[in-house]
């Protein structure tokens, strides 16, 4: 889990645009965050399995 101070820091608008980075809105994970959902791959998978993300289905081919 990310520290609370890091989550708050990520929400603030940075002084320079290049310093901005994405964090998961649920757990605060800084890596592998999907911009469209604002979630990391782990939280995205859990929410998709529970059906909390409308329109997201498991792929099969």
Swiss-Prot record:
GO terms for molecular function: rRNA binding; structural constituent of ribosome; zinc ion binding. GO terms for cellular component: cytoplasm; small ribosomal subunit. Keywords: Metal-binding, Ribonucleoprotein, Ribosomal protein, RNA-binding, rRNA-binding, Zinc. Binds 1 zinc ion per subunit. Its cofactor is Zn(2+). Zn(2+) binds at residues 24, 27, 40, 43. It comes from the Bacteria. InterPro entries: Ribosomal_uS14, Ribosomal_uS14_bact, Ribosomal_uS14_CS, Ribosomal_uS14_sf. One of its GO terms (biological process) is translation. Belongs to the universal ribosomal protein uS14 family. Zinc-binding uS14 subfamily. Part of the 30S ribosomal subunit. Contacts proteins S3 and S10. Binds 16S rRNA, required for the assembly of 30S particles and may also be responsible for determining the conformation of the 16S rRNA at the A site. HAMAP family: Ribosomal_uS14_2_B. This is Small ribosomal subunit protein uS14. It comes from Bifidobacterium animalis subsp. lactis (strain AD011).
